[in-house]
Amino acid sequence: MSNTFFAPLDEQWEPTRATLHAYAKGVGAIARAHAVPHPKWWHISLKVRPNGLVTDNLPVPSGGSVALRMDLVGDSVVIESSDGTASSVPMTDGLTGTEFADALIAAVANCGLEGDYLREKFVDETPREYDPQVATALMGVFVNANTVLERRRATLGDSVGPVQAWPHGFDLAFEWYGTRMEQYEEGGEVQAHPAQLNFGLYPAGRAYFYSNPWPFEGEALLGVELPHGAEWQTEGWKGSVLYYDQVAADPAAETKVLEYAAAVMSAALPTLEG
């Protein structure tokens, strides 16, 4: 298997990663306002494609649709319309998250999309740095991580969601759904949701793969040893992690990551089935 994805991450990439994260929040806010709503909020996510991180199609009230694409190789967010027109907002100009989102809002307005945007989702006045070479390298991470997640996802049958990049966390993941149902109160209403297990990559700080069962049944899980240095996580949030640097540059890294995901599911499955 190719080892490209598992090349070591450089801590000097963080300013550019943080910029991409800030700009993705603006993209996500536009998708939230205009995409066809999905009950699991999948409409606000981005999908990994060879040419970037792409929104769902955003319907234009007068007809047609628009999509936004974060082009990490071309260093811009491209706004493409079904009528053949396109525009872009460069990510290299040092704009704050607020300024960048406002530029995107103006661009989609020119395509016929106007609405009320949740500005708290993207307002950020931090000056932004952007290194094109780092952005290209990070795109490679997303593309190859997407492949690994899709390989795992393909083994799990029909009860899975798509692989998605989430603007709020700038992580990449999918979810598998069990048959156990959990009830809890939200907004004064009792809702039922299926138990679930995610699998993803968080690329910030000390980057890590994660796989988190919900509900997390510590008594059943914490005594199970995970492979390849992976460990259960109980501080701050509950789940499991396999740190990226534990497998980086290892020729067997992809296999080890997939074995980690399988081991978590094997341990958690009895707790997720009704």
Regions found by a protein language model. Give the residues of each.
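N-terminal ordered "arm"
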Residues: S2-S65
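Long, hydrophobic/aromatic-enriched structural stretches that serve as scaffold segments
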Residues: L46-E120
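Ser/Thr/Asn(+Pro)-rich, low-complexity disordered segments
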Residues: V60-R69, E99, W232-T234, S240-A248, ...
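Glycine-rich, often proline-containing surface loops adjacent to acidic residues and nearby aromatics
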Residues: D75-V89, L118-Q133, E235-Q246
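Secondary-structure boundary elements
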Residues: A106-Y117, N144-S159, G218, L269-L272
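Aromatic/basic-lined ligand-recognition segments
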Residues: P127-P203, Y208
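Low-complexity, glycine/alanine/valine/leucine- and proline-rich hydrophobic stretches
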Residues: H193-S240
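TerminUS-proximal long segments
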Residues: E235-G274
